[in-house]
From Swiss-Prot:
PANTHER family: BCAS2 PROTEIN, PRE-MRNA-SPLICING FACTOR SPF27. Keywords: Acetylation, Coiled coil, mRNA processing, mRNA splicing, Nucleus, Phosphoprotein, Spliceosome. Component of the pre-catalytic and catalytic spliceosome complexes. Component of the postcatalytic spliceosome P complex. Component of the PRP19-CDC5L splicing complex composed of a core complex comprising a homotetramer of PRPF19, CDC5L, PLRG1 and BCAS2, and at least three less stably associated proteins CTNNBL1, CWC15 and HSPA8. Interacts directly in the complex with PRPF19, CDC5L and PLRG1. The modification Phosphoserine is found at S94. Required for pre-mRNA splicing as component of the activated spliceosome. Component of the PRP19-CDC5L complex that forms an integral part of the spliceosome and is required for activating pre-mRNA splicing. May have a scaffolding role in the spliceosome assembly as it contacts all other components of the core complex. The PRP19-CDC5L complex may also play a role in the response to DNA damage (DDR). Ubiquitously expressed. One of its GO terms (biological process) is mRNA splicing, via spliceosome. This is Pre-mRNA-splicing factor SPF27. It comes from the Eukaryota. The modification N-acetylalanine is found at A2. Disulfide bonds: none annotated.
Amino acid sequence: MAGTGLVAGEVVVDALPYFDQGYEAPGVREAAAALVEEETRRYRPTKNYLSYLTAPDYSAFETDIMRNEFERLAARQPIELLSMKRYELPAPSSGQKNDITAWQECVNNSMAQLEHQAVRIENLELMSQHGCNAWKVYNENLVHMIEHAQKELQKLRKHIQDLNWQRKNMQLTAGSKLREMESNWVSLVSKNYEIERTIVQLENEIYQIKQQHGEANKENIRQDF
């Protein structure tokens, strides 16, 4: 329920879910759903109700490779197979048996393949020597990250629990005050009713006494004459 003395956009929520009762009573859920349905019928957003927002840039994080893949998928083209030509050692064709340039290219290709394999062997040797320790360090870092994340999670859960307890205590305290004030209001209303009824009775008695005195005065005057 919105307050009348609030700044535009501010809302005061007067619900006390930890204190209020009767949510499971028959018809309550249907009444709430009817209120929601009524509000949704009143809210008619226009087609450009998000016009105040900047236009989204869906391609902000796209790379050329991603863009090419999206275009390939849109065109329903098959993915290109991995080329294994660089790992082959073809000899010069029959027409190039006496071509020195062709043979030089084959030799260069063989040297590149050999160097590539040598680098792979060196990488395997380095991995065999240092890979185990590097993997252990990596796992230790992961463990520390998990422990830190779990501690943060526990802090958040405790904060949420404390907040819920605080909300519950505040609502129960407010509910008790409201119940006490309601009881006082009922008592005051009852007392006011009793006072008003007593006043009416006294006014009637005063009126009757005045009438009796008036009739007695008339009777005395009549007797005097």
